[in-house]
Amino acid sequence: MASQGTKRSYEQMETGGERQNATEIRASVGRMVGGIGRFYIQMCTELKLSDYEGRLIQNSMTIERMVLSAFDERRNKYLEEHPSAGKDPKKTGGPIYRRRDGKWIRELILYDKEEIRRTWRQANNGEDATAGLTHLMIWHSNLNDATYQRTRALVRTGMDPRMCSLMQGSTLPRRSGAAGAAVKGVGTMVMELVRMIKRGINDRNFWRGENGRRTRIAYERMCNILKGKFQTAAQRAMMDQVRESRNPGNAEIEDLIFLARSALILRGSVAHKSCLPACVYGLAVASGYDFEREGYSLVGIDPFRLLQNSQVFSLIRPNENPAHKSQLVWMACHSAAFEDLRVSSFIRGTRVVPRGQLSTRGVQIASNENMETMDSSTLELRSRYWAIRTRSGGNTNQQRASAGQISVQPTFSVQRNLPFERATIMAAFTGNTEGRTSDMRTEIIRMMESARPEDVSFQGRGVFELSDEKATNPIVPSFDMSNEGSYFFGDNAEEYDN
């Protein structure tokens, strides 16, 4: 990307920092995850969780959600102004699972938000540590990406279910900041913009007045974020058109959906970070590991190494397969929901299967599920190799206009071929090339038509042994050319519903 020099690395976005050198970045990311770990240990102490209970991923998620809720200013304000029956705006809580007489029991806990905020700040040297909160949001978002399908959401905004690989980060809250924007897929940004334009069409006052001015600023900011994800001049020029539109309407929606489709071949650059559950950082801190001193990176070997030595458990429903549950969480930990299964399988060292073949539901347990029959098992989160996470879409020639990988948004910087059926995709582009954006559309279609399926992405990049922390000896895997492995084929996952 040409503008690389002006961009902050994701670790800087993650930690809200200005430009820093590599060591400072590693230290500030280390400080962030260390703070999460200290907070988690403190919460486990207050809740009197045993070591085993503290390693239960469901307990980790309840604690993470409580702190996110405690710091959700906008929602807290809303709850105070619109009191609803039986909801205390000053409290937050959730299910904590404990082991009693060989059985798991669910206990609903309630906490003062103020108290949780105090505990969190204390663990983070008295600061609000927004970066740590965003980090937890991204972990939840990555888990949702691996667990649920967004077909309904896609169809509602006029997109096609086949665009599911563009939907990374679609469940991230609005308040997730620059680090959140970096991990959102092209489809997610398009969906947010389309929803906004639709509101403007239906509500005359949406763009008017003082509020409308703020709305307009938000609209243009979102357009710029999306523009920054595209890597070709024509796609960016179309985004300028959408952003500058006097009063955005159906023409802009058409343009955005066209751009989303084009991103199936001309991939956008979307960041990937390995964000782990709070309990993993807690375990490391408890064992005496000093994250800030050692430094930490979300895109290198560190998360792999951390998972190599962490034992995390999960509740398992009666007919779920523990190995499948492990795969789900492994994918979430490495932000690999949209990665090619061939690449994931190679790195993990065990076969990663498409979601349609998984015998497992989500990680979280609904409040009406029967605890009598719940069991627990160890999640297998270790890997055979490690690889560097990427923020490029895997386009081939000089990372510019060329074939990215259909139905895959690469997570790991690892060489792979791009088996794809161009015909299937180009079929989506018959139709409208007139209007203000006609020349750009023509140019984009031309680039897509010249994309060659036999190209190789991430040429020469490989995976590394876990002992090779300086990434000196890349092992370039060779994959079966014929089939690209998308996680979403034959999909029967549940929908994500708030």
From Swiss-Prot:
Q: Where is this motif: Bipartite nuclear localization signal?
A: 198-216
Q: Which InterPro entries match?
A: Flu_NP
Q: Does the keyword Nucleotide-binding apply?
A: no
A GO biological-process term: symbiont entry into host cell
* Record bears the keyword Ribonucleoprotein: yes
Q: Where in the cell is it found?
A: Virion; Host nucleus
Q: Which GO terms describe its cellular component?
A: helical viral capsid; host cell; host cell nucleus; ribonucleoprotein complex; viral nucleocapsid
Q: Give a short account of its post-translational modification.
A: Late in virus-infected cells, may be cleaved from a 56-kDa protein to a 53-kDa protein by a cellular caspase. This cleavage might be a marker for the onset of apoptosis in infected cells or have a specific function in virus host interaction.
GO molecular function, a single term: RNA binding
Please tell me which stretches of this chain the record labels as motif Unconventional nuclear localization signal: 1-18
Residues covered by region (Disordered): 1-21
Going by the entry's taxonomy, the superkingdom of the source organism is recorded as Viruses
The record's comment on protein family reads: Belongs to the influenza viruses nucleoprotein family.
Q: What is this protein called?
A: Nucleoprotein
